[in-house]
């Protein structure tokens, strides 16, 4: 097992094993490509000690990994439209429908290693929201932020941060 990356809460790990093996992390089977490459996304509040199970053709092996704790900031944003903080029932239905499409696209496995070409910034701008930060919107505590926001003028061209294959296009979504 080879494992590299950011061993911190919210980090990303890049692994390699025999392509015939099965990899499990947090009791979930991890997709492995034909070359044995895989990615582990560590959760915002990932346990500080974790196990990776490698199941080979003849034996199983457990690998212990240590994860460092990450400190998150609190982000207060006021002046947002009320429906963006507390959507009504019709908007909640829309959000649920859009979220389902996004979730399905995120779980689509492509037997490719686009990430190996590296990453660049998709747009120049000010970072206005970071992964993991706790959000207080119009004075109301909301779930942590699970993305990276970059402010740019409306109509600014945004490029892919890495080599990629588009698996979902959605226009005029509720939040994005």
Where does each model-flagged region fall?
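Surface-exposed, glycine-biased beta-strand/turn segments
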Residues: 64-176
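Short strand-edge motifs at loop-to-beta-strand transitions and within beta-strands
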Residues: 36-40, 148
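Short proline/glycine-enriched turn/loop motifs at strand-loop junctions of beta-rich domains
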Residues: 15-22
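Extracellular ectodomain segments of secreted/surface proteins
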Residues: 1-14
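Surface-exposed, short loops/turns at beta-strand junctions within beta-sandwich domains
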Residues: 41-48
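Short beta-strand segments within Ig-like beta-sandwich modules, predominantly Fibronectin type-III
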Residues: 28-34
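Structural motif
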Residues: 25-27, 54
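Short, exposed coil/turn segments at beta-strand boundaries within extracellular/luminal domains
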Residues: 56-61
């Amino acid at each position: 097992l080879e494992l590299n990356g950011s061993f911190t809460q919210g980090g990303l790990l890049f692994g390699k094993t025999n392509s015939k093996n099965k990899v499990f992390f947090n009791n979930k089977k991890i997709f492995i490509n034909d070359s044995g490459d895989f990615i582990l996304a560590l959760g915002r509040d990932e346990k500080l000690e974790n196990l990776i199970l490698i199941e080979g053709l003849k034996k199983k092996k457990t690998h212990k990994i240590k994860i460092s704790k990450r400190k998150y900031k609190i982000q207060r944003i006021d002046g947002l439209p009320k429906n963006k903080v507390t959507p009504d029932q019709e908007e909640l239905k829309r959000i649920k429908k859009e979220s389902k499409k996004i979730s399905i696209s995120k779980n689509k496995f492509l037997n490719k290693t686009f990430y190996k070409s590296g990453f660049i910034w998709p747009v120049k701008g000010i970072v206005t929201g970071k992964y993991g930060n706790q959000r207080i919107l119009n004075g109301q505590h909301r779930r942590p932020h699970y993305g990276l926001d970059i402010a740019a003028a409306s109509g600014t061209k945004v490029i892919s941060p890495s080599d990629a294959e588009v698996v979902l296009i959605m226009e005029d979504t509720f939040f994005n």
